[in-house]
Structure formats: C-alpha cells, structure tokens
C-alpha cells in the first residue's frame, strides 16, 4: 500500500508497560520491512482530585489524588499486508489502550 500511513496511539497509566508495548509494535513493523516513526512521547494527561478526609466537618483537612495517562504515538509508513497481519497478531497487556487510524 504505497503512500499510506498507519497511525497508532497508545495510552496507559503505567509508563513502563506502555514503553514495552511500543517497543513490541516497532519491532514487528521493522521485521516486515516497513518504515517506522516513533515511538513519540506525547504530553502526559494529569488529573488531580481533591477530597475531604472526614465525612462531616474539618474542611481544612483534604486529601489529593492524582491520575496520570501516558501516551505514545507510532507512525508506520508504507505498510505491507504482511505488516498489518503481524500487527493484528500482537498480544499487548491489558492496561494498554490502542487506537489505530489508517
């Protein structure tokens, strides 16, 4: 498929798990002789939650929780049918969200 590009976006809470998954995808794409751009680290989404510690009063006593979503972007340029087939067979961990655009 000349002139085409596959864009893969990965999201996870654990950055180590995310990097392992990105490495697997890049290795598979390179083994099928496709050009790979990435993994490109995208900005981390950081969400803070502020909660009262006590159920009734003591408004000054609060607890803060944080959620971080790490993201990576991988572009596969001029993929072959072999590449697409190999990408479909990859087993990725459960904590990694994969979004693919052609």
Swiss-Prot record:
Record function comment: Involved in the binding of tRNA to the ribosomes.
Single GO molecular function: tRNA binding
The organism of origin for this protein: Thermotoga sp. (strain RQ2)
Keyword set includes Ribosomal protein: yes
Family annotation (InterPro entries): Ribosomal_uS10, Ribosomal_uS10_CS, Ribosomal_uS10_dom, Ribosomal_uS10_dom_sf
Keywords per UniProt: Ribonucleoprotein, Ribosomal protein
Pfam families: Ribosomal_S10
GO biological process, one term: translation
GO CC term (a single one): ribonucleoprotein complex
Assembly mode: Part of the 30S ribosomal subunit.
Taxonomic lineage of the native organism: Bacteria, Thermotogati, Thermotogota, Thermotogae, Thermotogales
Protein name (record): Small ribosomal subunit protein uS10
Statement: the UniProt record of this protein carries the keyword Ubl conjugation: no
Family, per entry: Belongs to the universal ribosomal protein uS10 family.
């Amino acid at each position: 498929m000349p002139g085409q590009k596959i864009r893969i976006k990965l999201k996870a809470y654990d950055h180590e798990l995310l990097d392992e998954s990105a490495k697997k995808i890049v290795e598979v794409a390179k083994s099928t002789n496709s050009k790979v751009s990435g993994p490109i680290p995208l900005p981390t989404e950081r969400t803070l939650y502020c909660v009262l510690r006590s159920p009734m009063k003591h408004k000054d006593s609060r607890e803060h929780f944080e959620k971080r979503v790490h993201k990576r972007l991988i572009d596969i340029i001029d993929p072959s049918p072999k590449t697409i087939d190999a990408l479909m067979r990859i087993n990725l961990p459960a904590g990694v969200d994969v979004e693919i655009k052609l």
